[in-house]
Amino acid sequence: MPDKTSYIFSNARIATLGENAEGLGLIDNAVLAVKDGKIAYVGPENALPAEYASFEKIDCENRLITPGLVDCHTHLVHAGNRAHEFELRLNGATYEEVARAGGGIVSSVKNLRAASEDDLVRETLPRLDALIAEGVTTVEVKSGYGLDRDSEIKSLKAARRLGEERDVTVRTTFLGAHALPPEMNGDKAAYIDRVINDMLPAIAAENLADAVDGFCEGIAFLPDEIARVFDAAKAHNIPVKLHADQLSNLHGAALAASYDALSADHLEYTDADGATAMAKAGTVAVLLPGAYYFIRETQKPPVELFRAAGTKMALATDNNPGTSPLTSLLLTMNMGATLFRMTVDECIAGVTREAARALGLLDQTGTLEIGKDADLAIWDVERPAELVYRIGFNPLWKRVFKGQI
């Protein structure tokens, strides 16, 4: 394979995922030209511009090319694991009971605060490598296990370093409003003050966050508390995202939409008004079947409402130590189909085009269109449905990141 960024993939089936394409935008007998790390042409081989005819050709032998996969919701940077809580839940404890007893997110805080930045990078890289091995070229990574200024900064710096250690685009999200740390003794107002006046200004000053997130739930923060964080984020010109309506309907989806959020995530209890508000605002619904499966939820996100409203839907692993220790977007797609009844096209778009949209990156990646980064996944499959259908099997042939094979 050429160690350069200008060449042609020939003899391929290509799923462009273009905005105006029908379905997945499939093109048979297609070629994709890469020039200087960007997509220069994608389409029928017989229409290839003459200027690319001399480029070295790589025969795909009729394999399928899709955009590189995008995991748009992860908590990839964390220390330790919570296998003991998994056992507790197997014995009957609920997520809420574990959290209120001092477990859950707060139990990860102790581990992260004790870890160095180097420790965090070292522990996270194997999880990132698992995603990369399945064709992921872009990953979002949240903080939220530090819950104080220095630890949140440490988390975000570790996340940024992942993109230096591996050929992958990393988008960082500040999730200070994730849980109330034990030292606050239940004083949520004072903690939100700390998020707004201490953590966020320091993080913004170092340009460490591409977005600001919050956990809007009875066991975390209420809508008025999240609104304070979002107002502060907007003052720093940082876009927002929201963990919303996972365990109850606090109208988090509508709250996110009112701030033109990039995405609202989980959404098991979102109602029709929330779905409509998201569609109007262009806020992507990021569905997380790994968490639904792992904590044995019974309330499914309202996929039919999202379809009816025209709300864009993405899928993500939600990789985290407590409720979704999942490092496979291929399995996530299968779960989206089997658990949430999403279609094959919705699942594949959900980990490419719509996931890129949820990160504000659709102008750069997520579809195979001229001028975008040559982020590609090439699969040894006959039809796209195989990517969603198989369980525990990885048919990736080649992964391309910004033109580099």
Curated annotation (Swiss-Prot):
<feature type="binding site">
    <location>
        <position position="73"/>
    </location>
    <ligand>
        <name>Zn(2+)</name>
    </ligand>
</feature>
<protein>
    <recommendedName>
        <fullName>Imidazolonepropionase</fullName>
        <ecNumber>3.5.2.7</ecNumber>
    </recommendedName>
</protein>
<feature type="binding site">
    <location>
        <position position="82"/>
    </location>
    <ligand>
        <name>4-imidazolone-5-propanoate</name>
    </ligand>
</feature>
<feature type="binding site">
    <location>
        <position position="73"/>
    </location>
    <ligand>
        <name>Fe(3+)</name>
    </ligand>
</feature>
<dbReference type="GO" id="GO:0008270">
    <property type="term" value="F:zinc ion binding"/>
</dbReference>
<feature type="binding site">
    <location>
        <position position="145"/>
    </location>
    <ligand>
        <name>N-formimidoyl-L-glutamate</name>
    </ligand>
</feature>
<dbReference type="InterPro" id="IPR011059">
    <property type="entry name" value="Metal-dep_hydrolase_composite"/>
</dbReference>
<feature type="binding site">
    <location>
        <position position="243"/>
    </location>
    <ligand>
        <name>Zn(2+)</name>
    </ligand>
</feature>
<feature type="binding site">
    <location>
        <position position="75"/>
    </location>
    <ligand>
        <name>Zn(2+)</name>
    </ligand>
</feature>
<dbReference type="GO" id="GO:0019556">
    <property type="term" value="P:L-histidine catabolic process to glutamate and formamide"/>
</dbReference>
<dbReference type="InterPro" id="IPR032466">
    <property type="entry name" value="Metal_Hydrolase"/>
</dbReference>
<feature type="binding site">
    <location>
        <position position="320"/>
    </location>
    <ligand>
        <name>N-formimidoyl-L-glutamate</name>
    </ligand>
</feature>
<dbReference type="GO" id="GO:0005737">
    <property type="term" value="C:cytoplasm"/>
</dbReference>
<comment type="pathway">
    <text>Amino-acid degradation; L-histidine degradation into L-glutamate; N-formimidoyl-L-glutamate from L-histidine: step 3/3.</text>
</comment>
<dbReference type="Pfam" id="PF01979">
    <property type="entry name" value="Amidohydro_1"/>
</dbReference>
<keyword id="KW-0378">Hydrolase</keyword>
<feature type="binding site">
    <location>
        <position position="323"/>
    </location>
    <ligand>
        <name>4-imidazolone-5-propanoate</name>
    </ligand>
</feature>
<dbReference type="InterPro" id="IPR006680">
    <property type="entry name" value="Amidohydro-rel"/>
</dbReference>
<feature type="binding site">
    <location>
        <position position="318"/>
    </location>
    <ligand>
        <name>Zn(2+)</name>
    </ligand>
</feature>
<dbReference type="GO" id="GO:0050480">
    <property type="term" value="F:imidazolonepropionase activity"/>
</dbReference>
<dbReference type="GO" id="GO:0005506">
    <property type="term" value="F:iron ion binding"/>
</dbReference>
<feature type="binding site">
    <location>
        <position position="318"/>
    </location>
    <ligand>
        <name>Fe(3+)</name>
    </ligand>
</feature>
<feature type="binding site">
    <location>
        <position position="145"/>
    </location>
    <ligand>
        <name>4-imidazolone-5-propanoate</name>
    </ligand>
</feature>
<comment type="similarity">
    <text>Belongs to the metallo-dependent hydrolases superfamily. HutI family.</text>
</comment>
<keyword id="KW-0369">Histidine metabolism</keyword>
<feature type="binding site">
    <location>
        <position position="246"/>
    </location>
    <ligand>
        <name>4-imidazolone-5-propanoate</name>
    </ligand>
</feature>
<comment type="function">
    <text>Catalyzes the hydrolytic cleavage of the carbon-nitrogen bond in imidazolone-5-propanoate to yield N-formimidoyl-L-glutamate. It is the third step in the universal histidine degradation pathway.</text>
</comment>
<keyword id="KW-0408">Iron</keyword>
<feature type="binding site">
    <location>
        <position position="243"/>
    </location>
    <ligand>
        <name>Fe(3+)</name>
    </ligand>
</feature>
<keyword id="KW-0963">Cytoplasm</keyword>
<dbReference type="InterPro" id="IPR005920">
    <property type="entry name" value="HutI"/>
</dbReference>
<keyword id="KW-0862">Zinc</keyword>
<feature type="binding site">
    <location>
        <position position="322"/>
    </location>
    <ligand>
        <name>N-formimidoyl-L-glutamate</name>
    </ligand>
</feature>
<dbReference type="GO" id="GO:0019557">
    <property type="term" value="P:L-histidine catabolic process to glutamate and formate"/>
</dbReference>
<keyword id="KW-0479">Metal-binding</keyword>
<feature type="binding site">
    <location>
        <position position="75"/>
    </location>
    <ligand>
        <name>Fe(3+)</name>
    </ligand>
</feature>
<feature type="binding site">
    <location>
        <position position="178"/>
    </location>
    <ligand>
        <name>4-imidazolone-5-propanoate</name>
    </ligand>
</feature>
